[in-house]
């Protein structure tokens, strides 16, 4: 899996992730592998190969780091998913 990170401060970054089954796993992996710290916000475009349909799949995940807590955020939801160690 690949993740393209669009940070709120304007920086962009590409990282390779181990396979993640949920948005929560993506958020945690991006925060750990993408070197995000307290106060960072980002939109993450996750790309993976779908072998059954022989095409790439994309999904967007919004991540915010509050202190050392990782949150999935949207216009209506702010969900705690883990902590940065």
Q: Which residue ranges define each predicted feature?
A:
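Short aromatic-glycine-(Arg/Gly/Cys) micro-motifs in beta-strand/loop hairpins
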Residues: 1-12
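Short low-polarity hydrophobic stretches
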Residues: 4, 26-27, 72, 82
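A short, exposed loop/beta-hairpin motif centered on an aromatic-Gly-Thr core
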Residues: 11-21
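A short, charged, amphipathic alpha-helix used as a generic interaction element across diverse proteins
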Residues: 21-39
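Short, mixed-charge low-complexity intrinsically disordered segments
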Residues: 36-85
């Amino acid at each position: 899996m690949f993740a393209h990170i669009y940070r709120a401060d304007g920086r962009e970054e590409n990282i390779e992730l181990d396979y993640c089954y949920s948005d929560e796993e993506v958020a945690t992996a991006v925060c750990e592998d993408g070197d995000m710290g307290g106060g960072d916000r980002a939109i993450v475009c996750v790309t993976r190969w779908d072998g059954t349909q022989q095409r790439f799949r994309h999904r967007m995940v919004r991540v915010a780091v509050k202190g050392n807590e990782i949150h999935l955020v949207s216009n209506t939801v702010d969900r705690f998913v883990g902590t940065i160690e």
